[in-house]
């Protein structure tokens, strides 16, 4: 959620910044509601002061043994009723303002380019595209040759967009997850296994709700409204809520977490023919990294997360590139995002395996996640950051395709061999 004071005090600057992401925003109605709200709050404060003064007078009269005139009690009752009336009238105003503010995306950082994917910029490329002296196979064919993935039975069990890992497919998948987990533990991140079913407030704090509430798998009969529960689309949705409604100590920051979960996605639209196999599905495994930091530390934290994700891909020996996303290609909650994209030879494309993002204080405002400065005792919002570390459903196809030999065998990345038990499949 954006800072209302910033919108009020520098409306044009906020409008201009948001134009990088969305169409022009008209703040007229919001500012009008804000004026009403502030006037009502002022009236309530004046009446509360009058009530306090009347209560003090009653106490003084009683302490001196005097008799309190009934008019005092009548006045206090009238003031209390008026306060209650004004506070009731504040509720719909606040509701309208919250609805408006919750629909706004985060303000992009100044160094983020406007527009969509067409303005994404490649920062650097790691390694060379693999060159084959034979006709390379795609990951679906290689999976079939080695009996790694059962797409047919996955569809039978759950429908399109699902698959079954089997044999060395399951072993490779588990090896990847173990490799990622081991590296994050070495780096001092705390391991979290969160619930997979979350409440509405989790989606709202993350910035995914209310806009995207129909793009998740809902659970049970409470499918609508704030009583709904849903299956997490990413562990970020859980991790950003760990400290919701909390005030942290300054010396507790930064807090560094990572979580393993399957991710469940209701994808809009149809898949491209080239995105068959594991490239896009309704369920996939992912390790998610997350940090809570002080505002002045979040830029360095983003660099750390990017570096960690890149190190994992480098460790696997995969060719990839790092791209900085333009504003409209960043998710609504994020001020800045970098994507790590691995090369998929059969598609002649790079596909994202990690997004590393800085939400600044956008999610913290929604979830009331704050910290107290040790020196000033001032309470401020934390900054929140996340990065995939990594998503396996793109990594495994990249390994199969980039590491294949002419005979269809697959070279197992060295970092995975202690779990796989083989150098080659």
UniProtKB/Swiss-Prot annotation:
UniProt-listed PROSITE patterns: AA_TRNA_LIGASE_II (PS50862)
Q: Where does ATP bind?
A: 265-267, 352-355
GO MF assignments: ATP binding; catalytic activity, acting on a protein; serine-tRNA ligase activity; transferase activity
- Annotated residues that bind L-serine are located at 234-236, 288, 388
- EC annotation from Swiss-Prot or TrEMBL: 6.1.1.11
* Record-linked Gene3D superfamilies: Bira Bifunctional Protein, Domain 2 (3.30.930.10), Serine-tRNA synthetase, tRNA binding domain (1.10.287.40)
One GO location term (cellular component): cytoplasm
List the keywords (alphabetical). Aminoacyl-tRNA synthetase, ATP-binding, Cytoplasm, Ligase, Nucleotide-binding, Protein biosynthesis
Tree of life domain: Bacteria
Pathway named in the protein's UniProt entry? Aminoacyl-tRNA biosynthesis; selenocysteinyl-tRNA(Sec) biosynthesis; L-seryl-tRNA(Sec) from L-serine and tRNA(Sec): step 1/1
The residues forming a coiled coil are: none
User: Which Gene Ontology biological process is one annotated for this entry?
Assistant: seryl-tRNA aminoacylation
Q: Which PANTHER family match?
A: SERINE--TRNA LIGASE (PTHR43697:SF1), SERYL-TRNA SYNTHETASE (PTHR43697)
Domain characteristics, as noted in the entry: Consists of two distinct domains, a catalytic core and a N-terminal extension that is involved in tRNA binding.
What's the family?
Answer: Belongs to the class-II aminoacyl-tRNA synthetase family. Type-1 seryl-tRNA synthetase subfamily.
This protein's assembly is summarised as:
Homodimer. The tRNA molecule binds across the dimer.
Q: What does this protein do?
A: Catalyzes the attachment of serine to tRNA(Ser). Is also able to aminoacylate tRNA(Sec) with serine, to form the misacylated tRNA L-seryl-tRNA(Sec), which will be further converted into selenocysteinyl-tRNA(Sec).
Q: What is the protein name for this chain?
A: Serine--tRNA ligase 2
* Organism in which the protein naturally occurs: Clostridium acetobutylicum (strain ATCC 824 / DSM 792 / JCM 1419 / IAM 19013 / LMG 5710 / NBRC 13948 / NRRL B-527 / VKM B-1787 / 2291 / W)
